[in-house]
Amino acid sequence: MPIWLGILVGVVALVAGVALGFFIARKYMMNYLQKNPPINEQMLKMMMMQMGQKPSQKKINQMMSAMNKQQMK
């Protein structure tokens, strides 16, 4: 086997592995986000109402900013 053919096979295998890994990771993340959607203000408001609290916009904004800060850590 010539050396250039070995290098070519290695490069093609590397590119194919990267492409396959990208599509598998993309599919996994789309499934994950479909099963566990991120919490938005509407969902937070509904949760507060279910807990018996009256949701004010100020409280919702405080909780959203606290959740965003916690995610950044």
UniProtKB/Swiss-Prot annotation:
Family: Belongs to the UPF0154 family.
Location in the cell: Cell membrane
TM region positions: 3-23
Main location, first listed in the record: membrane
Name of protein: UPF0154 protein BCB4264_A3788
Keyword Secreted: no
Membrane topology: Single-pass membrane protein
Disulfide-bonded cysteines: none
Domain of life: Bacteria
HAMAP family referenced in this protein's UniProt entry, alphabetically: UPF0154
Keyword annotations from UniProtKB, A to Z: Cell membrane, Membrane, Transmembrane, Transmembrane helix
One cellular component term from this protein's GO annotations in UniProt: plasma membrane
